[in-house]
Amino acid sequence: MQTDLSNSSLFNHKSVMTDEILYSIDQYPFISDNKLTAIDATLGGGGHSYQLLKKYPDLKIIGLDHDPIARESALNKLEEFKSRIEIIPSNFSNFEPKEKVSFVIADLGVNSNQIDSPERGFSFQKDGPLDMRMNPLIKMNAENLIETLSEKDLADLIFKFGDERLSRKISRKIKKDLKEKGKYSGTKDLAYSIAGCFPPKQRYRKIHPATRTFQALRIAVNNEIEALEKFLKIAPDWLLTGGIISIISFHSIEDRLVKNSFKGDYRLKNLTKKPITPNKKEIENNKRSRSAKLRIAQLK
C-alpha cells in the first residue's frame, strides 16, 4: 500500500529535516528492521549520517562529497561510527555503488560552513574572493565565469538559475563595472554592484538583492543542475526493490526537477504528493531551513 508522507509534521552546520527523514524510513519495516546499507549522497558535515547511524545500530553508510573540507568535518563528527561509515571523494553524479542499498538521501543545500567561510566566496555577508567552488580542483570559479561570459550569456544564466527578473540590467552593470575596475575586489564588491540595479526601497529588504544572482553563479560554477539531472537518472538503480530515496531541495529549480523525476520515472512510486516542509520549531531554530522541501520516492 502506498503511503503519502506529505502530511507528516515531525520535527549543527544544522542538518535540516532529519526527523522527517528518520520518520520516512520507519514507515518501511523492510528497511528499518534489517541490516542495511545506505548512501548519503551529500555527506557535508555528516549531520544526517550521524543521526541515522545513531538510530540504526546495524546501519552502514557510504557518504559522498567532493568537498575535501566537508569530508574532513564529517570524518571528525562520525569518529565514533568509523567502522560503519565509508567516505568517498565523489560528486553524486559520478558514483556507482558496488551493491544496491536500502535507501538514499541527498540534501542539495549549501553547507553552512561553506557559506560562513569567507575564503570560499559563497556569501556577500563576509567579504571573500569570488570563488564559489565546492570542489577546489575544478578550474572555473565565479570570477572566471563573470570575466569570460558575454553580457547576454551572463544575463541568461542569472535568469535561468536565479529566477531574477532584472537579469539583463544586472548583467549589464556587472560587465560595465568590471570593465571600469578591471577586477572585482571580492564578494561584497560584486554584491554592491548588483544592489545598484534595484530601487532604493528594495536594497534593504530581508532578502538581499544580490541573493538570486549569487545563487545563479554558484549553480553555474558547480554544474549543479546538470549533476542533479544525472543523479536523478542513476539513483533509482542504486536501490534494492522497495528501497526509498529522500531528497531535500532549497530552490524552485531543484524542487521542480525532483518532483518531475519522482512523478515521471516508471521505476519509482512517488510518496509525497506535496513536498514536506520544516515545521515551525525547526524554522525558528534554523532560519536557513525555511525554504527546504523534502520529497520521497520508493523503488517499485
From Swiss-Prot:
* Compartments (UniProt record): Cytoplasm
Q: What EC number(s) is this enzyme filed under?
A: 2.1.1.199
Q: Write down the CDD domains for this protein, in alphabetical order.
A: AdoMet_MTases
Q: Which HAMAP family match?
A: 16SrRNA_methyltr_H (MF_01007)
A GO CC annotation given for this chain: cytoplasm
Q: Which reaction does it catalyse?
A: cytidine(1402) in 16S rRNA + S-adenosyl-L-methionine = N(4)-methylcytidine(1402) in 16S rRNA + S-adenosyl-L-homocysteine + H(+)
Q: Name one GO molecular function term.
A: rRNA (cytosine-N4-)-methyltransferase activity
GO biological process per UniProt: rRNA base methylation
Alphabetical list of InterPro entries matching this protein: RsmH, SAM-dep_MeTrfase_MraW_recog, SAM-dependent_MTases_sf
Name a Pfam family for this protein.
Methyltransf_5
Please state which protein family the record places this protein in.
Belongs to the methyltransferase superfamily. RsmH family.
User: So what does this one do?
Assistant: Specifically methylates the N4 position of cytidine in position 1402 (C1402) of 16S rRNA.
Query: Which keywords are on file for this protein?
Result: Cytoplasm, Methyltransferase, rRNA processing, S-adenosyl-L-methionine, Transferase
Q: What is this protein called?
A: Ribosomal RNA small subunit methyltransferase H
Whether S-adenosyl-L-methionine counts among this entry's keywords is: yes
Q: Which NCBIfam families match?
A: 16S rRNA (cytosine(1402)-N(4))-methyltransferase RsmH (TIGR00006)
Q: Does the keyword Transferase apply?
A: yes
User: For S-adenosyl-L-methionine, which residues are the binding ones?
Assistant: 46-48, 65, 92, 107, 114
Which gene does this sequence derive from?
rsmH
